[in-house]
Every structure is written in C-alpha cells, then in structure tokens.
Amino acid sequence: MKAAVVEEWGRAPIYTDHPEPVARDGGVVATVEASALTNLTKGLVSGKHYASGELTLPVIPGADGVARLEDGTRVYTGALKPYGMMAERTLVDPDGAVVIPDDVDSVTAAAIPNPGVSAWMSLEHAAAIRPGDNVLVLGATGVTGSTAVQLAKSAFGAGRVVVAGRDTTRLDWLRTVGADDAIAIGTDDLRARVARLHAERPFDAVLDYLWGEPAEQVLDALGTSELAARYHHTRYAQIGSMAGLTMTLPAGILRSAAITISGVGLGSIPPEVIGRIRAQALPKMFAMVAAGELQLGVEARSLTEVERAWTAKEPSGTRIVLTP
C-alpha cells in the first residue's frame, strides 16, 4: 500500500510504499478516508514531544482519523501501533471507534476530534467551566482555540467569553460564533485590557494556548489587579505553547491571587476521562457540526502531497486534512 513514512526524527514524511497492516490482537484492518495534519501528529514524530519515545522509526504518522471498517461502517478512530492513519489502510480497535453520522463528511469528521476533544477536556476537566462563568481564551484564533470559544458558549453555557489573539479578522469572526469581547495582541495592551476586564468582572477561567510572554502578561494582570485584596478563584488551564515553551512567573502572583494552574495533555488528564469524553462528547460535536452549531475551517489535500503540506504554514483557523 501507499503511506506517508517518517524515516528520520524531525523530517517531513515521504509518500512511498509500505507493507500492508495485518490483523492481530483484536485489531482489524480498516480503509483510511481522512487524517488531520495536527500539531500533535507533527510533534510525535519530531522526536522532541514527551510521547515521542513510544514510537520507533520508520513510522507512519497520523494520530487519528476517519476509516471505514470491513462492514462499511465509517468511524473516527486512532491507529494501533506501529501503524498510523496517514496510509491507505491501517490497524484499528473497532471497540474504541466512534461512528460518524451520514450528514458529516469524512474530511470534516477527521478535523473535529483533535481540537474538539482537547477543547472539551480543557473546558470540563481543567477549567471546570460552569454555566455563567466568565472565560478568557488566550490564543483563540487558532483551530483549537476557536473550537473552545464555540463550545464554551454553546455546550457549557459560559456567561461571557473574551478572546485574545493576533489575527484581527479571526477575532471579528469569533464574535459571530460566541465571543463577547476581543483583545488584539500586538495592538491592544494585553495586560491592561485583562486587568480592566478582570476588575469589572473577575475571570473564572483562562484557557491558554500561547504560554510565553502573553501568559506572563495575563497572569500578572490577574495577580496584581485591584481584586488582589479580594478573594476570587481563577482556574488557569495551560494547553498550548505557540508563543514560547517557557515563561517567568513571579512567586508573588500566586500569593496575591487565588490562581490554580493545571495542564491539559496526554499525561495530565486521567485516561478514563479522555475515554469518556471521546465516547460521549464526540457524538455531540458531530451533531453540532451537522446542525451548523460548531464551525471549523478545513482544507483537504491528497496524501501524495504530504511532504509539501507538512512544511506549509497552516492557514489561520483552518485544519489541513490528508486523504489517501
């Protein structure tokens, strides 16, 4: 069969021949229809991701995707090691698959789960969003951030959602799908805007997809605002690091305000919670997509273009999906 194959850590995969998968240990061979080119997929084969050690080269990338089982059922699933989803066929566990409704196409269905499940875990588990909560989404213009904005309002009942990001066109669009206010990073004074909004109505939760300097400014605003003298608990969920892998956090910030910081990733959420969210929330999100209540930009490309797609800059707010 044809597949995308990574032969060296950190290098783009090549489109080449690969041995067919063989059914074993409860896994069945399925025909792949689509697999999203996500940051997780790229990170795992970079050799630098904290889960890269579980892989052995050469490897077929593709953490998850849409496949068709032998009986014709179309499902969202992950591939069983050592296979990935960026191939014509792969090995899957049918018991862990989620059936895709007929009114959601395979490309969209492949794009939704990664940002959707991540956003849902962040909202439910780390940020613990409750109806009426005041939420700040830092780095909201990306695929996962914009998904979180929509779910915060429509699925979790957030009372106010403030979005922050650099792409002003995307910020304007986010106002049409649930955002109540927007902060343009690089144009607005991020720290001052967050401090003022926090003083007017304290943030119950922050979803941070950036880290780095923007996170420093936000945490400084939360920790040194006029509210520092009054107790209000803010749940800070750290999800991404698009603006930097490190940041400086003065100890005084954590002592001057009730801020709880927790991470969202493969090792920070209990496996049973991840499994439950995939099983219960994905069908809800597929239904929301079909009803037009959850929107995500997608761009389909042939798997034959994997080398070019891998190194190309992803359009803002759009997820590239590869199809065999």
Where do the PLM segments sit?
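C-terminal hydrophobic helical "lid"/dimerization subdomain
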Residues: M1, E272-P324
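Glycine-rich beta-strand-centered segment in the early N-terminal region that forms part
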Residues: E20-L37, K48-G84
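NAD(P)H dinucleotide-binding glycine-rich loop of Rossmann-like/cofactor-binding domains
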Residues: P61-D64, V75-T141
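N-terminal Rossmann-like NAD(P) cofactor-binding module of classical short-chain dehydrogenase/reductase
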Residues: Y76, V206-L207
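Short, glycine/polar-rich helix-capping loops at beta-to-alpha or helix-loop-helix junctions
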Residues: M86-A87, G165-W173, T246-A251
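Mid-domain Rossmann-like dinucleotide-binding core that forms the NAD(H)/NADP(H) cofactor-binding site
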Residues: I112-D188
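Short amphipathic alpha-helix with an adjacent loop that forms part of the alpha/beta core around
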Residues: D189-R201
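Glycine-rich phosphate-binding loop and adjacent beta-alpha segment
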Residues: E213-A291, P324
